[in-house]
Amino acid sequence: MKPYPRSERVAARIQEILSDLIKKKVQDPRIELVTISSVRLTSDLRIAYVYFSVFGDEARVEEATQGLKSSHGFIKRHVASQLGLRYMPELKFIHDQSFDRGTHMDQLLKSVLKGDDSE
């Protein structure tokens, strides 16, 4: 028996393919700073939720989202050719806000520590 479900193995492979594709083959400048942080796949392998992060502000995130939407067909064809599944999962790109929340928490902790030092 495999150590983890097929959906997790396929999700890991999709993440690997997408990361490589964005780094090397997609020439859209709107998504050059996009990082694929994780992929979650439904148990029936029909929908892949692709979580991405972008270095920059909200305008940069919106640009990256539009870039991913406009490149969706190219990305899906490339992933399908590399994946070799009977059915290619539908890719749904979602901005991963965990990095933003982590940065915000870090700033809050630093401000609290600075406040303690001044007292």
Curated annotation (Swiss-Prot):
Main location: cytoplasm
Function: One of several proteins that assist in the late maturation steps of the functional core of the 30S ribosomal subunit. Associates with free 30S ribosomal subunits (but not with 30S subunits that are part of 70S ribosomes or polysomes). Required for efficient processing of 16S rRNA. May interact with the 5'-terminal helix region of 16S rRNA.
Coiled-coil stretches noted in the UniProt entry, renumbered to this chain: none
Keyword Lipid metabolism included in the entry's annotation: no
Localization per Swiss-Prot or TrEMBL: Cytoplasm
Keyword set, alphabetical order: Cytoplasm, Ribosome biogenesis
Subunit note: Monomer. Binds 30S ribosomal subunits, but not 50S ribosomal subunits or 70S ribosomes.
Name of the featured protein: Ribosome-binding factor A
Keyword Cytoplasm listed: yes
Domain of life: Bacteria
Gene3D superfamilies: 3.30.300.20
Family: Belongs to the RbfA family.
One Pfam assignment: RBFA
A single MF term (Gene Ontology): ribosomal small subunit binding
GO cellular component: cytosol
GO biological process, one term: maturation of SSU-rRNA
